[in-house]
């Protein structure tokens, strides 16, 4: 009995569980989960570079710095295209990759994609309602990071993910009513984005869809309350117009704004012909060939890896959250998610960006 009595004396006194203690543990858990997601993004940025495309970007940047900063009108690295116009819409990213290589070689390229991946992870995990636990937001961010992991390479796709994340961050703030300066933030973002990446039109596309949903919501509310639509809608249309017009701020304004046409009518069909998914070597060729095929293609679907599975799961989560919420205020996000899902069904290349939209919607 004395041993049991000594053991009881050594045990700490029981403390009552208070709401303050529960809140403190929740905050600590949210902090750890959030930074675990960011560390996962950084870790996934440390991957092998097995694509030769960055070498072309390096030489392109070197050539532009040696002959002026602006891109040439023709492809100087091709004998067959020497006399033909070859617009390099993403010319500014060539400079970024070339300078990264010039400063630190392959380590510079690795640091570039690690930094971009970390920024994307940081922004995704810090989009939440103030005062509300962020554990679910962090889980959605993890799914988005895994879905984007296949694009953590020193290519313009890095800019696509960062640009889409920034766009959704500002639209999320607008949804919460805490956004300011969107009339200049979004157009400036897209103007810079379109010189770094030919897929900047995705950002303008999401902006148009989101504000279209906001306009529909305002009209429904005004019709039910017999109230006049507020003139604030004019500022929304101004933001939309400037965001689309920002695609013209490029040395090649025509090809920049027509990038989606070129992408779906020229680039993707050419890549499909070059990298088939129906031959026996497709299963051992880890060259991202599924990106150029529809997700509804059975041959492409069987080649899906963890990134595509995570993206599909996140899209499903986004639609489930919108279904459970069922509020008109989310029409903007619903329009954006529906159209980005449609684009990803058309070509798997857009699945990471659709996953980013879904992560913000679901979180």
Where on the chain are the PLM-derived regions?
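Membrane-interface helix-loop-helix junctions at transmembrane boundaries of multi-pass membrane enzymes
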Residues: 129, 218-236, 303-310, 316-336
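Juxtamembrane membrane-water interface segments that cap and precede transmembrane helices
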Residues: 88-99, 258-309
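Short hydrophobic alpha-helices at membrane interfaces in multi-pass membrane enzymes
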Residues: 173-191, 234-238, 334-338
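Membrane-interface alpha helices of multi-pass inner-membrane proteins
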Residues: 41, 144-148, 183-198, 207, ...
């Amino acid at each position: 009995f004395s041993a049991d009595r000594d053991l009881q004396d050594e045990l700490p006194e029981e403390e009552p569980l208070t709401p303050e203690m529960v809140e403190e543990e929740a905050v600590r858990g949210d902090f750890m989960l959030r930074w675990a997601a960011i560390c996962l993004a950084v870790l996934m940025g440390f991957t092998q570079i097995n694509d030769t495309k960055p070498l072309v970007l390096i030489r392109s940047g070197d050539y532009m710095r040696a002959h002026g900063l602006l891109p040439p009108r023709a492809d100087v690295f091709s004998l067959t295209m020497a006399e033909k116009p070859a617009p390099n819409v993403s010319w500014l990213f060539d400079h970024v990759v070339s300078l990264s290589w010039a400063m630190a070689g392959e380590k510079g390229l690795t640091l570039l994609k690690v930094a971009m991946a970390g920024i994307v992870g940081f922004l995704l995990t810090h989009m939440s309602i103030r005062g509300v636990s962020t554990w679910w937001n962090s889980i959605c961010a993890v799914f988005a990071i895994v879905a984007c992991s296949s694009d953590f390479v020193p290519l313009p796709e890095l800019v696509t993910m960062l640009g889409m994340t920034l766009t959704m961050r500002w639209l999320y703030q607008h949804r919460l009513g805490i956004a300011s300066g969107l009339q200049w933030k979004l157009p400036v973002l897209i103007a810079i984005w379109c010189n770094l990446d030919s897929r900047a039109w995705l950002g303008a596309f999401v902006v148009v869809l989101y504000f279209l949903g906001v306009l529909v919501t305002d009209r429904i509310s005004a019709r039910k309350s017999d109230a006049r639509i507020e003139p604030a809608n004019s500022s929304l249309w101004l933001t939309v117009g400037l965001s689309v017009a920002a695609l013209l701020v490029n040395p090649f304004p025509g090809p920049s704004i027509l990038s989606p046409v070129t992408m779906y009518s020229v680039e993707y069909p050419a890549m499909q012909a070059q990298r088939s998914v129906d031959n026996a070597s497709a299963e051992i060729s880890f060259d991202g060939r599924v990106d150029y095929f529809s997700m509804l293609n059975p041959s492409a679907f069987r080649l899906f890896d963890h990134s595509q599975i995570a993206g599909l799961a996140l899209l499903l989560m986004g639609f489930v959250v919108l279904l459970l919420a069922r509020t008109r205020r989310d029409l903007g996000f619903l329009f954006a998610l529906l159209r980005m899902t449609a684009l990803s069904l058309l070509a798997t290349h857009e699945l990471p960006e659709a996953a980013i939209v879904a992560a913000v919607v679901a979180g």
